């Protein structure tokens, strides 16, 4: 988006390691079912290269310089310490489900080891352990916009069935078609999840890392609580 707006970033720092990439290769064949997402990703990387954005893969020890405001970012790349001057730094360490609403009504949650996040416990229809409550989209898990829409349709079918508006046969037939679409949409996820796992630095931040910017709470504050 920045590149297309005419203000491309000066660099892209990725914490992905060589071992992450090698592990992801076992999922390549399955990911080909979602080839459009792979083509889209390669196209975006090509767009960044054409714009002159330097891509640094395998960086570690990332930290932001500055006191009152950001002045740059420090990191290690290929064993050497480096620093880039910048007053606008965008951080991203993966996407996690939005669980606030589900937690507020007492929905049970489980730990997702692959994505390192908690997600609501739901059945194949999206229904949770709170009667009549269905959870789909980014509140249930990470699968992308198209997968979220399909999950929404599956949940809607179940609601119609429970309300007596459609028969069990119609429910099964229509759900079967939607589940086939969902498998196709989700085919690329194992590859992406293993190729781009959350960085260890993000999972185990040092004490000075600001965890909550609003309240200026650091990782050390939380550990000492």
Give each language-model segment a name.
Residues 1-225:
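Residues forming the flavin
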């Amino acid at each position: 988006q920045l590149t297309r707006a005419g203000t491309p970033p000066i660099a892209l720092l990725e914490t992905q390691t060589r071992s992450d990439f090698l592990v992801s290769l076992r999922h390549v064949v399955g990911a080909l079912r979602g080839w459009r997402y792979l083509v889209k990703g390669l196209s975006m990387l090509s767009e960044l290269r054409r714009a002159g954005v330097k891509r640094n893969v395998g960086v570690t020890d990332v930290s932001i310089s500055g006191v009152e405001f950001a002045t740059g970012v420090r990191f290690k790349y290929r064993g050497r310490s480096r620093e880039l001057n910048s007053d606008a730094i965008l951080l991203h360490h993966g996407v996690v489900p939005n669980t606030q609403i589900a937690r507020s009504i007492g929905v049970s949650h489980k730990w997702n080891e692959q994505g390192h996040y908690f997600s609501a416990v739901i059945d194949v229809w999206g229904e949770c352990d709170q009667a009549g409550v269905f959870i789909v989209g980014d509140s249930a898990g990470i699968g992308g916009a198209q997968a979220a829409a399909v999950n929404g349709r599956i949940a809607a079918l179940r609601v119609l069935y429970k309300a007596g508006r459609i028969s069990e046969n119609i429910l099964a037939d229509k759900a079967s078609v939607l589940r086939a679409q969902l498998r196709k949409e989700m085919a690329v996820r194992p590859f992406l999840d293993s190729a781009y796992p959350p960085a260890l630095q993000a999972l185990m931040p040092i004490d000075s890392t600001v965890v909550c910017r609003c309240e200026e709470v650091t990782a050390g504050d939380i550990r000492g609580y």
